[in-house]
Amino acid sequence: AKAANVQIVTGDTKVVKKGEVDKIYINTAGIGMIPDGIDIGPHRVKAGLDIILSGAIGDHSIAVMGQRFGLDLSDSLTTDCAPLNKMVQAVLDKVGTQVALLRDPTRGGLGTVLKEIADQSQVGIKVEETAIPIHEEVQSVCNILGYDPLYLANEGKVVLIVEPSVTDEVLKILHSFEEGSEAVLIGKTLDKNIGKVGLQTAIGGVRLIDLLGEDQVPRIC
């Protein structure tokens, strides 16, 4: 809360029978405000916009799974949990009117979020597989266990859909924060193939991305 400059304004406790709860359970509800002049949502997404991803995907799912199941993973592979409000605020302060949508690729991962955007906004989406950052350790685990990193949960990433005229500026802002140091342009919205997400693969083909059918790993968040 301190890192995100969030105030904890109230709390509550519950009394349960002895032995029913052996650890602390925490549940939170956040309340925020939408700044004046900011209009962000699926209704703003149209064809011809750029899609930016703030960093590498899959770290959180694989790190948590490794701890849960005792996998011997690299010490460098850790959850990506991080407060993003300061980074996002910096983008909105500078080019807020040119930002159409912000989404968090949490449960269901990047693939599910992109498909939801295509459906809700009635646009087509094309993304480049080679542009999507995936750390080597994550890709290795996915290769061994048969997971698709596009559908792994993330806890410290954001997808931004912006006007092409501000893409370079948005990337510069994101790169100035540790949480956005690996931010990249991954694709565009289209006026064709409405409701579909096409992944341009490394070998030159196109793979259609759909919603996550079922969790690849046990629920982690």
Predicted regions and their residues:
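Helix-biased detector of long, well-ordered alpha-helical tracts
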Residues: 1-221
